[in-house]
A protein has these predicted regions:
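Charged, glycine-rich intrinsically disordered N-terminal tails and low-complexity linkers that flank
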Residues: 1-131, 135, 264-269
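Nucleic-acid nuclease catalytic cores
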Residues: 118, 135-259, 263
């Protein structure tokens, strides 16, 4: 049996991504890897506590809220620049809050921004690639291949990491990763991006990667390139050792019904 951790989510495990909750990620990993076991324990939890658990992805939640309160989210989902994105995000949040004053505003903002920011980044990835090719006069190779490698094996499971790269500069043997910023360019590599780029370098056995951050304003796209070199010490101490520690705790959880129910109690409360 294999357990695969995505490169884009590995930093949640290592603690370098402070924006996403570890318990929520564990719940997601459990559901993805052991769906029948997850549903069985969710039913046990529901019966024990006499509650109905309604599980929704952020996308499903936003769609439900928009339909319930008759709020059009299409303009936001089709935003071509960051100013339009932010303006329409605020409009959606305000309209939903007006119609449902008791709604948790923090959770609403998180839901709207997570869905629409991710959508914006995905839709503008090709534009960023074209801009980069024009600026550098290169033709970056792209692929839809999912790369994965086994990291270690425990008594019960094979642990793997995997992911898809945005592009590869074949002339310079360098991985290219695009990040579409929403508010500003950072001009530095953030911690969770270091974990992600290191993972891609490990998967493809490359020593160099390049994070290209872009900010799309009306009529203009700003771009900054951050060079990232392979760091074996960082990989071993900050990623592999922390992943091994996580694997031990996750496997303990998977081996105990009592721990699973306690975890659901803590996470779903």
């Amino acid at each position: 049996m294999s357990i695969c951790i995505f490169a884009s989510e590995l930093a949640i495990i290592t603690g370098h991504n402070k924006y996403q909750n570890l318990n929520e990620y564990i719940l997601k990993l459990w559901k993805k890897t052991f769906p029948s076991d997850y549903q069985e324990h969710l039913d046990l939890y529901s019966n024990k506590n006499n509650v109905e658990i309604v599980q929704q992805t952020p996308e499903e939640k936003l769609l439900e809220l928009s339909k319930k309160h008759n709020v059009n989210i299409n303009e936001c989902l089709n935003a071509k620049d960051t100013k339009t994105l932010q303006t329409t995000q605020n409009s959606i949040i305000n309209k939903i809050q007006e119609k449902d004053p008791k709604i948790d505003l923090t959770e609403l903002k998180k839901c709207v921004q997570q869905v629409t920011n991710t959508n914006f980044g995905t839709k503008n990835e090709k534009n960023s690639l074209n801009q980069y090719n024009t600026k550098t006069q290169k033709n970056i190779a792209t692929t839809n291949k999912f790369f994965k490698k086994e990291i270690f094996t425990t008594k019960k499971y094979k642990w793997l990491i995997g992911g898809k790269i945005d592009g590869l500069d074949e002339d310079e043997d360098t991985i290219i990763e695009f990040k579409n910023r929403v508010n500003r360019l950072f001009y530095k590599l953030r911690d969770y991006e270091r974990v992600q780029t290191m993972t891609y370098m490990f998967l493809l056995e490359k020593n160099k990667s390049r994070l290209v951050e872009t900010l799309k304003n009306r009529g203009d796209t700003q771009m900054n390139v951050i060079e990232v070199a392979w760091d074996s010490d960082f990989w071993e101490t900050e990623i592999i050792e922390k992943l091994k520690s996580f694997s031990k705790e996750f496997e303990k959880l998977m081996n105990s019904t009592k721990k699973k129910l306690e975890f659901l109690e803590e996470t779903l409360e």
